[in-house]
């Protein structure tokens, strides 16, 4: 085992680096545990090392390891680490994938076909489902439904599923008008009968199917998997945990959960903000030494955490600066000051200057960034277009157009190698403006994809519609890439939401404090500015939130969770940006910050 660990360290860690004692304790642990890993403590690296250890342990047996996480990016990161350790392909009996893919593939599909036999199941994004729902609801809506009234959003309604009732699988909760409810229920059930469902529905199907054959699965699963490793456990929903508990008998399968409970931000806008991950104190293991940032940032992160985090310490080689705050008038002023601060600090610190990591301004909502930076902030145009992103862009346009017109599932065919090669030829013709080649290539591809008779009636019309949409989408992307440096003087600073920074490491991060929190979005609700909600976190002493919280304290907890994620991203420089118009509301704030070690940057000198 010692030799294996040395080999893992050599291939997975930076030169001359070793796993810490608390990391090794987790890597070697063979019992069920809850691993609480702080920001920058090497959670994914430890998880990858643990997987390698287990693969070696079960080699030659018929049992596999099941690894579940929440995003394809996380899956790719784990697989990339395993390739460094000589594992190029994940084969049965092992499984590494997203939790949603696991339930969709092994349970939801089987449940669906049990109910609707050979009907094709199509799992669509929420926005596509909403469009299809609107089209169906529009035909069924009651006579009193005004034309100028917006159509309902199915994502915002609670739907009860009863797959034992073959007459009506779905029933919306909370709609009292019987005609409205009939139209809503009828629309959802019609789409289900056509095989058009969402990921949320897949979990409900899985739940029904697992309950139906629970004892069989609990007997079979331990024969297939010896271990379940659950990554990002803090983002796992109550229903997902219930499904895992129903499937995996924890007396026969070792279950090891990894995550940071303080980074649970995906559910903060919903009604249920409680953490679904119930950490067992007797099984808890902590990885609390961060190598991402130094003690100045550690102290900031500890102070915004929703719970006391005394054991978070730094063993980082990075020399983190003291925290800075910037008072700004508008977006240009903030960009100018932040950019100047970075330049000044780069002139004093070689490691900061040489770092190629991101420089970021993050805010809670897209709208905050749009209001502050205007056209400089483009939600979709912050990434460089690569060969793969060209492909993603093309597939996004094509699938949306086809999904609106036909009920077929095109994704599997589009994954075929020969179709991918065709698509790259079409993209090339699109970029080089070779219209005839573009049209011929698209017609050939559509002939292979679409079997619906309606297609032959208006083939040219559909081709023209898709080409127009492709040209608009690609021209916007290409234009944004070519002109971004001209429009945006500080193009090396990324503008984004806090949610999109999760999992990233930056050289410098500024959290823009210009968001208003309104509980439940009720018209009569009081609103709380983020500066008001976080000001207690800028004191020397940690201020704990009470167990029973009033409305303002609930919003403060949300703000702290978001600040914790944002302010734990950088290696060297952490900042906050405060709008000038908030200073008069908080007259002591500047002095409070200065008294607790924050430095103010005014773009003339460092105070």
Regions found by a protein language model. Give the residues of each.
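The feature marks helicase ATPase cores and/or their adjacent C-terminal helical subdomains
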Residues: 1-607
């Amino acid at each position: 085992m010692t030799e294996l660990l040395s080999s893992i360290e050599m291939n997975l860690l930076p030169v001359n680096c070793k796993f810490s004692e608390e990391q090794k304790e987790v890597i070697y642990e063979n019992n069920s545990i809850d691993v609480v890993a702080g920001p920058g403590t090497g959670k994914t690296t430890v998880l990858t090392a643990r997987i390698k250890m287990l693969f070696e342990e079960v080699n030659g047996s018929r049992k596999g390891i099941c690894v579940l996480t929440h995003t394809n990016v996380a899956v790719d990161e784990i697989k990339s680490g395993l390739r460094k350790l000589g594992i190029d392909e994940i084969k049965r009996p092992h499984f590494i994938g997203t939790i949603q893919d696991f339930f969709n593939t092994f349970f939801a599909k089987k449940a669906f076909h049990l109910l609707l036999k050979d009907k094709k199941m199509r799992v669509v994004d929420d926005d596509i489902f909403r469009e299809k729902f609107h089209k169906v609801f529009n035909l069924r809506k009651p006579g009193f439904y005004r034309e100028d009234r917006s159509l309902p959003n199915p994502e915002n309604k609670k739907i009860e599923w009863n797959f034992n009732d073959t007459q009506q699988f779905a029933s919306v909760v909370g709609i009292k008008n019987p005609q409205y409810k009939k139209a809503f229920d009828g629309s959802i059930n019609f789409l289900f009968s056509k095989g058009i469902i969402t990921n949320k529905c897949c979990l409900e199907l899985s739940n029904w199917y697992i309950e139906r054959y629970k004892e069989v699965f609990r007997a079979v699963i331990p024969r297939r998997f010896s271990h379940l490793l659950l990554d990002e456990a803090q983002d796992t929903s109550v229903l997902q945990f219930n499904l895992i508990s129903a499937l995996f008998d924890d007396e026969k399968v070792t279950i090891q959960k990894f995550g940071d409970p303080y980074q649970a931000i995906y559910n903060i806008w919903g009604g249920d903000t409680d953490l679904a991950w119930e950490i067992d104190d007797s099984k808890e293991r902590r990885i609390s030494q961060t190598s991402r940032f130094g003690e100045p940032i550690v102290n900031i992160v500890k102070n915004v955490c929703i719970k006391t985090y005394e054991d978070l310490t730094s063993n980082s080689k990075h020399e983190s600066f003291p925290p800075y705050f910037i008072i700004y008038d508008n977006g240009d002023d903030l960009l100018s000051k932040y950019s100047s601060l970075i330049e000044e600090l780069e002139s004093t610190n070689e490691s900061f200057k040489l770092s190629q990591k991101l420089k970021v301004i993050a805010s809670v909502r897209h709208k905050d960034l749009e209001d502050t930076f205007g056209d400089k902030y483009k939600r979709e145009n912050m990434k460089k277009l690569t060969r793969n992103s060209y492909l993603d862009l093309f597939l996004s346009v094509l699938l949306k157009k086809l999904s609106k017109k036909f009920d077929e599932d095109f994704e599997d065919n589009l994954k075929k190698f020969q179709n991918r090669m065709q698509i790259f030829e079409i993209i090339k013709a699109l970029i080089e403006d070779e219209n005839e080649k573009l049209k011929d290539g698209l017609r050939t591809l559509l002939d292979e994809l679409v079997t619906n008779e309606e297609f032959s009636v208006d083939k040219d019309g559909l081709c023209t519609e898709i080409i127009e949409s492709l040209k608009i989408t690609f021209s916007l992307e290409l234009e944004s890439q070519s002109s971004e440096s001209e429009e945006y003087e500080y193009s090396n600073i990324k503008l984004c939401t806090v949610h999109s920074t999760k999992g990233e490491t930056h050289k410098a991060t500024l959290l823009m404090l210009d968001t208003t929190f309104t509980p439940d979005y009720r018209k009569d609700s009081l609103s709380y500015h983020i500066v008001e909600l976080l000001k207690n976190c800028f004191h020397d002493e940690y201020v704990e939130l009470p167990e029973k919280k009033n409305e303002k304290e609930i919003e403060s907890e949300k703000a702290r969770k978001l600040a914790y994620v944002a302010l734990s991203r950088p290696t060297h420089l952490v900042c906050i940006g405060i709008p000038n118009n908030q200073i008069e509301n908080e007259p002591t704030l500047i002095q409070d910050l200065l008294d607790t070690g924050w430095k103010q940057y005014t773009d003339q000198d460092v105070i």
